[in-house]
């Protein structure tokens, strides 16, 4: 259940727990898989299944500074693509973040068909070596015009020192972001329409779930690692829950 501050619209309270993924075994939970490849040419990272390790209490996605196929870094990417997707509901990622300039952690929802329309919901991103600032965002990649809506909040706790819950509620016409059960931002279809922006989040296509740890290029948001960035760097996922 989320706490909504004054000024927030009432979010739908989804009560049926439809997925309860615990990353506490020797293998990824059924429905999750590790992928190989790049991020469509973005970032300085080649993702490899070998960079995903089960610790017994979490899935550890580790970035290393070892070149592969023209990319200077390797790291881990896991998703439910092809196994589970959702149109509306609440998603809760319980995770522990790495610390370091150039590290770009992501907990997000993507649509399988990158044609028309195509949207992306970022539940959590953390970068710039700042483990107190959480970013949540929406992206419309098609139809044109492309647009992004960025929200953020500052955590009192250091996200690299323990596990926290990063949450999003997707309901018809509205997206709500939260950390540890406290909502910090909302964005609505009405706001998008007023700004002349398409809204691909109600088309019924469904979104699958992704967790990845990328390493940024110098020209990208957050910038590249520097001499203070320690490798290997690890993001841990303990659980993912979905209510509908």
Predicted features and spans:
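GH16 jelly-roll
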Residues: 2-244
């Amino acid at each position: 259940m989320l706490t909504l501050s004054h000024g927030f619209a009432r979010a739908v309270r989804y009560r049926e727990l439809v997925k309860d993924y615990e990353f506490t075994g020797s293998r990824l939970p059924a429905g999750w898989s590790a992928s190989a490849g790049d991020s469509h040419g973005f970032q300085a990272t080649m993702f490899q299944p070998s960079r995903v390790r089960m610790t017994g209490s979490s899935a550890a996605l580790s970035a290393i500074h070892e070149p592969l196929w023209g990319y200077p870094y390797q790291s881990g990417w896991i998703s439910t693509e092809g196994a589970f997707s959702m149109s509306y509901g609440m998603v809760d990622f319980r995770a522990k973040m790495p610390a370091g300039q150039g590290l770009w952690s992501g907990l997000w929802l993507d649509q399988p068909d990158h044609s028309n329309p195509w949207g992306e919901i970022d539940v959590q991103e953390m970068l710039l070596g700042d483990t107190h600032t959480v970013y949540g965002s929406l992206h419309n990649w098609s139809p044109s015009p492309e647009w992004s809506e960025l929200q953020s909040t500052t955590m009192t706790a250091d996200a690299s020192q323990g596990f926290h819950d990063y949450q999003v509620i997707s309901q018809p016409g509205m997206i709500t972001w939260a950390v540890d059960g406290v909502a910090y931002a909302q964005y609505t279809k009405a706001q998008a329409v007023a700004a002349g922006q398409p809204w691909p989040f109600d088309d019924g296509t469904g979104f699958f779930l992704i967790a990845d740890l990328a390493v940024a290029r110098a020209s990208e948001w957050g910038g590249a690692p520097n001499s203070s960035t320690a490798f290997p760097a690890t993001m841990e996922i303990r659980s993912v829950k979905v209510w509908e």
